[in-house]
């Protein structure tokens, strides 16, 4: 299979008064990395633009987001150490101001302190992260420009290294929300349940799978349901979206011999996917 160089998505509204337009363009390097993504909400109507640069190890070294086709909203340049870990981020904003984020780690790489300061060396924000022996985050604390805690997250993991409990805490470290995760024997997520500090149910996600461990049904708090069908190659060919018993959308997809999506039909519009390949 040839390497994809670019993807262009053309959207055609089913409203007779609307014209087809290019809704998304994605550009790739020879390693398959997305180096640019352009999105449009209508014919010539800019929505977003992101450009990304990578080093020889396929690690991100620069990300630029745009306000419009030409004006930069934010640019981040990532400085990495010999191990490839980010130790400094230079940030440029649309008004020309800059800030710097320094990432401090202990000798065992069990903690990270991410400190962002503006060009006047004033604190903008701070993020503290603690890791377990397997390198998974077990504590994440966010601080404001006064170095005051704004919120925190505590994580627990099961014996397979999958997150089992996530707690969201407020600025006084009191519980806002506790989320539990349940998995199948194959490690697929079956249930995610969130409860507030009183133990009242906030929301849940229930997922069902077929014999190939593909998602066939997702239910969000019993209010929104997504149902999926697949072809013999495992490509999703039908997705149905429901609010209660009412179908909100039905998406049917077609693929080429390489399992690249080439068309998508929805209730209100259709999409055509066109590819350019490297020689």
Name every feature range the model reports, one short phrase each.
Residues 1-279:
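Buried hydrophobic residues that stabilize the cores of well-folded domains
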């Amino acid at each position: 299979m040839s390497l994809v160089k670019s993807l262009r998505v053309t959207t055609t509204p089913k409203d007779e008064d609307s014209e087809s337009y290019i809704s998304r363009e994605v550009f790739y390097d020879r390693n398959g990395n997305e180096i640019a993504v352009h999105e449009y909400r209508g014919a010539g109507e800019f929505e977003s633009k992101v450009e990304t640069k990578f080093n020889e190890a396929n690690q991100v070294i620069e990300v630029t987001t745009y306000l419009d086709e030409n004006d930069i909203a934010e640019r981040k340049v990532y400085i990495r150490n010999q191990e490839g870990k980010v130790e400094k981020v230079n940030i440029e904003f649309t008004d020309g101001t800059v800030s710097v984020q320094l990432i401090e780690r202990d000798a065992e790489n069990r903690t990270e302190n991410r400190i962002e300061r503006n060009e006047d060396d004033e604190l903008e924000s701070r993020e503290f992260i603690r890791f377990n022996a397997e390198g998974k985050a077990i504590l994440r604390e966010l601080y404001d420009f006064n170095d005051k805690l704004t919120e925190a997250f505590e994580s627990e993991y099961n014996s397979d290294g999958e997150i089992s409990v996530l707690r969201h805490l407020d600025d006084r470290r009191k519980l806002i929300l506790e989320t539990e995760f349940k998995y199948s024997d194959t490690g697929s997520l079956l249930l995610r349940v969130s409860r507030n500090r009183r133990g009242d149910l906030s929301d849940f996600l229930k997922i069902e799978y077929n014999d190939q461990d593909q998602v066939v049904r997702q239910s969000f708090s019993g209010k929104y349901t997504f149902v999926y069908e697949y072809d013999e190659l495992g490509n999703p060919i039908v997705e149905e979206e429901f609010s209660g018993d009412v179908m909100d959308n039905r998406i049917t997809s077609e693929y080429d011999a390489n399992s690249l999506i080439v068309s998508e039909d929805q209730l209100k519009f259709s999409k055509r996917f066109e590819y350019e390949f490297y020689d």
